[in-house]
């Protein structure tokens, strides 16, 4: 069973380097390593608490990134990256907020990028996170309802054929609205939805071209959720097999198990486990530090966490949970883990190189070749 494809995703953090240099370097690496796509995040600030974004926990990366919460705007950056885009590489946002941006503006931005890239834009979209909405006055009581309406609005505008369109909606009503940008050669950007809960999975089946969850931790959970997406697609009269089963996953690798275990103990890496719902923690006999019923990454507000709070939370992360949250191990072990997910339906993985945040510069450098070996191995799956 083959056909697995992969892409890279980077955070758009302002650094001491020229704004586009890190992204263009990653794009070049993606091309060399055979990646299908390059993605950027969409955040007003970081998901890493600023209280631990120091050299003590980030190592040399903290010298290049003096302010972890200084994030570039993704669509502006993607427009720049579209110039000189390597052949066949696709560009995507992973993922944009459905509520913080009016869906008409999102539809326009994605359609513009699709024209700039000659049909290689991907619109990744989800509910977003509380940290990028509520502090800025965006209503957050019903994020899933807003998401459903945003997705329906984008599709309605793209399918309007340049005719006036009116549509009732509790969040994004259209009254004689006009959307006249053309698709590229008859095709709109693919919509990839970051869905996890039942309603989001149903919306994915109705509207999306791909499903790209971020916090599904077990392959068995992945296959069950994929069935829900496909069932919703069938109910909507769509071909369920036309929806690409994807996922965003971090990779922690190194020369040997000792290096990997050391990287997994990083406070910054452990913070990713806070984004996992409380029920996943409970399976390992530990209550989520933010409450047994905590929903996960969408409700974290990291900029308010002080150092002691972060360290106390990190100390509670079960080692077994950490190994579910990311692919980890030697290159061969990581490839075997990805293969297991493939056997549960995964066909596309968007990768975060978690080895880059090791506080040890030497360990970060020595993880480069093992990471490249993983990527070469993925092309054979």
From Swiss-Prot:
Its EC number is 1.2.-.-. GO terms for biological process: lipid metabolic process. GO terms for cellular component: cytosol; plasma membrane. The keyword Ribosomal protein does not apply. InterPro entries: F420-G6PD/mer, Luciferase-like_dom, Luciferase-like_sf. PANTHER family: 5,10-METHYLENETETRAHYDROMETHANOPTERIN REDUCTASE, PTHR43244. Belongs to the mer family. Phthiodiolone/phenolphthiodiolone dimycocerosates ketoreductase subfamily. This is Phthiodiolone/phenolphthiodiolone dimycocerosates ketoreductase. It comes from Mycobacterium tuberculosis (strain ATCC 25618 / H37Rv).
